[in-house]
Amino acid sequence: MSTAIQPAGTAGGGGSDSNGLADVVDTILDKGLVLDAYVRVSVVGIEILTVDARVVVASVDTYLRYADAVNRLDIVNEDPKSDLGGLVGDVAESATSGVAKGKTTGVLEAAGEKLGDMLTSDEPEPRKATRVRSRRADR
């Protein structure tokens, strides 16, 4: 008795295997295959590391439908001032702007007072007295 082994591609009764890969690719492009990962590492509200990886094997239409459905068209859609770093930045910014505003206001007020004093002064400025020598005293 002899046994014959047929190659996998020529097995009988299975349908058309020549279109197998094309069917798989067509199905993947039609349905889409998306591997999406968003990782954020923070310590005490301060963001240290952000990894946003997206691997998509799909047609453009399929991907756009997916992205629209899960709101992933814009990768970063969060308020940057919602974390501790944003709040600390706001406090520091307001403190420095307050100090700068105070100094500027003080300088402007002092300059205004000085200018007002100069303009409203009724007294003539004192002149420096000069000596006039007579020729007779030198003789």
From Swiss-Prot:
InterPro entries: Gas-vesicle_GvpA-like, Gas_vesicle_GvpA, GvpA, GvpA-like_CS. Gas vesicles are hollow, gas filled proteinaceous nanostructures found in some microorganisms. During planktonic growth they allow positioning of the organism at a favorable depth for light or nutrient acquisition. GvpA forms the protein shell. It is found in: Gas vesicle shell. NCBIfam families: PRK09368.1. This is Gas vesicle protein A. Disulfide bonds: none annotated. It comes from Mycobacterium sp. (strain KMS). The gas vesicle shell is 2 nm thick and consists of a single layer of this protein. It forms helical ribs nearly perpendicular to the long axis of the vesicle. Keywords: Gas vesicle. Residues 113-139 are annotated as: Disordered. Its main location: other. Belongs to the gas vesicle GvpA family. Pfam families: Gas_vesicle. One of its GO terms (molecular function) is structural molecule activity. It comes from the Bacteria. Residues 129-139 have a biased composition (Basic residues). One of its GO terms (cellular component) is gas vesicle shell.
